[in-house]
Amino acid sequence: MSALRQNDRWRWLTAGAVAVCLLAFTLLIGLLGWQGVRAFWPQPVDQYQFQPPQGAPLMVLGETLDRQQQGDRWRYVVKTGNRDFAAPDFRVIVSQGEAQTRRPAEALVLQRRSGGNAYGWLVELREDNEVLTARDRDALLQQRLKQVHEQLRQASNIRRIEMARLNAQLESLQQQADEQRRGGHFSLQDQSELDANSAALHKRFGALAQQLAHLQHESQRDTLVLRDVQGDDHLIPLAQVVAAWYPNSLSLGQKIGHFLSQIWQFVSDSPTSGGSENGALPAIFGTVLMVLLMSVIVMPLGVVAAVWLHEYAGRNALTRLVRIAVVNLAGVPSIVYGVFGLGFFIWLIGGTLDQLFFSRSLPNPTFGTPGLLWAALTLALLTLPVVIVATEEGLSRIPDNLRQGSLALGATQAETLWRVVLPLAVPAMLTGLILAVARAAGETAPLMLVGVVKMVPELPVDAVFPYLHLDRKFMHLGFQIYDLAFQSPNIDADRPLVYATALLLVAIILSLNLLAMVLRHRLRER
């Protein structure tokens, strides 16, 4: 009877621990979700008239973040925006008595590429300083915004794809010519061919430059005049505006549509203002690409090491020592792996590769500098113990009778391993992959040493051969969270983006893990 009571105590204890873990995870997701939604949901804009304890009345327009009564005084925290002409964009105001408040339906919010939001009233739209007239100025504003965004998109494609491809061809021609000169095989005919090819490429580049300049000029023609709460007018180019809306006059359906469009803009656009505003596409792309490349590297190494330890290595002191070393590697701080990756992969291996295969680019390093390949290798080394242990656990659960039966039927040990043992161990391998992805996607400290940066001019994948550039630096959601939370000059404005980026990172990790779990379940059914 006492044994049953003891078991009941342990059962309740374990059930309580599971409940606490689930509650903590739910609260974490709830906090990230609630705070992250605030970054995209259109907040109402209030117009206040404050009466400070001393001084003249104060007019303020913005989003109300907090309001507290302190005796006969009221304390307000208002996001007033307009950072470039009415800094700061967050204000704490103490009013003598409750402030007079109203929500003007015509109040306009502008999400800009830099400088934060702008709040005010639309006075007029201009094209080349000529005032545009229309019955519905809001519809005209949205139409002009779409037109400007399309021009900016075309200009970006020319700059990132077509001009980048021509630049790569010009650099390749110049490097080939320099290599021939160093080898003493550069003739007058080679020089004439080089001049002809370079002239043709420069001609195409000049045509693209003219087209790019035309698009940039067209995108700068449209401007709007915004009147702030103090009555001052400000000229804002539409090329600097990401989105414009009237939050106080939106219906529920319009708010949902705006919310979805803001989420899409966040996950599909590039960041501006040093990475502290607008989109997170490069960070999403870099995170997923790095995790996939790490998985491709770590899975073969981990599976081969586990198979050797369990199937081929004898039970001796050396094997026990290797297992102890593998298990202890999982406890090494991640920053140590970053230092190892910097010293071994980048300086030693990368520097050697540059001298052997990319000497014509020296002293500019190609692989002797932090990049995507070294980040993936470093995290593969970091997660290797997890894959080895999980795979070896799966191999140990396979009955020896299956191995012995296969050998008795005439199969070799290699055939038994390939046709009997490994198919049964695939779910365990995928379990190791799930654990490796979960850890690698959230690592930040080692990546700061081996390849991640705050902003990148180009993605590791583009239209220039060889299309996947393993030597390029990349952005990562974990580092972006750190940068927004601790390195931003305006943390109050970036706080919602911190929560939104953290929620996005959790969603990506859960999606990758769910994909691996579905694959494991299907293989298990087979």
What are these regions, as identified by a protein language model?
Residues 300-305, 336-339, 374, 381-402, ...:
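Membrane-embedded alpha-helices of multi-pass transport/permease systems
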Residues 294-326, 339, 347, 516-525:
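Transmembrane-helix boundary motif in ABC transporter permease subunits
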Residues 339, 343-349, 429-469, 482:
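Non-cytoplasmic
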Residues 388-392, 398-399, 413-451:
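Transmembrane alpha-helices
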Residues 1-15, 22-275:
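Membrane-topology segments of multi-pass transport proteins
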